[in-house]
């Protein structure tokens, strides 16, 4: 929610682009953007496996991260528009693709570094496109944001979840007595959702 409301004034019909679209955050961005009438380009590593599932959540385009000439081919599908916001959880070459997609004056917000590779920004992206680079660390935002802003965000998210408009995939539910197994499962590279500990079961 902070990603979509805190950096760019999005309006219905705008496009945004994100990598790691199959992550928990990525799935939430898809659903929240749909609620706002904002359209999404979603880069993933396994598009054929994920396209149907992410489209059901509200994704407009699901694209292979490493497809050949992916920026040009994807922009051709946007009817002359470009995304005004990019959500970056990966870094490295993936972040460069996001910046290349952006409209002049667009913003890329980085909240993760899954590739563990630094972002090397071509000078032209800053000089000629005027792209803005920002970071998001929710822990820091929670420390400094006004209490009413935090409450409003939680209230909105809770309402959407209660309505069924915001869902989160769950891979496995473990009883508290199996916390070790839960941690091991959470560290696996490929999962189909969150790992949940059920606190009222031993």
Regions found by a protein language model. Give the residues of each.
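C-terminal capping/lid region of NAD(P)-dependent oxidoreductase domains
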Residues: 80, 158, 163-172, 180-202
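Short amphipathic alpha-helix with an adjacent loop that forms part of the alpha/beta core around
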Residues: 69-81
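Mid-domain Rossmann-like dinucleotide-binding core that forms the NAD(H)/NADP(H) cofactor-binding site
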Residues: 1-67
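Local beta-strand N-terminus motif with an aromatic residue
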Residues: 13, 59, 82-83, 126, ...
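Short, well-ordered coil/turn residues at beta-beta hairpins
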Residues: 19, 88-89, 199
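Glycine-rich phosphate-binding loop and adjacent beta-alpha segment
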Residues: 93-165, 198-202
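N-terminal Rossmann-like NAD(P) cofactor-binding module of classical short-chain dehydrogenase/reductase
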Residues: 17, 86-87, 109
């Amino acid at each position: 929610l902070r990603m979509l409301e805190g950096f760019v004034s999005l309006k219905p019909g705008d496009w945004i682009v994100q990598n790691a679209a199959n992550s928990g955050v990525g799935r939430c961005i898809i659903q929240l953007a749909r609620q706002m009438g904002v359209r999404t380009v979603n880069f993933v590593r396994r598009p054929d496996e994920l396209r149907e599932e992410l489209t059901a959540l509200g994704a407009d385009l699901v694209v292979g991260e490493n497809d050949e000439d992916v920026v040009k081919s994807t922009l051709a599908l946007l009817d002359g528009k470009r995304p005004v916001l990019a959500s970056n959880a990966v870094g490295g070459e993936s972040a460069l693709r996001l910046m290349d997609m952006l409209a002049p004056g667009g913003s890329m917000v980085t909240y993760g570094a899954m590739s563990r590779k630094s972002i090397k920004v071509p000078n032209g992206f800053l000089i000629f496109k005027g792209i803005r680079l920002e970071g998001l660390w929710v822990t820091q935002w929670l420390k400094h944001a006004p209490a009413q802003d935090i409450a409003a965000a939680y209230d909105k998210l809770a309402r959407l979840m209660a309505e069924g408009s915001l869902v989160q995939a769950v891979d496995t539910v473990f009883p508290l007595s199996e916390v070790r197994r839960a941690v091991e499962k959470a560290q696996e590279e490929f999962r189909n959702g969150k790992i949940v500990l059920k606190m009222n079961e031993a």
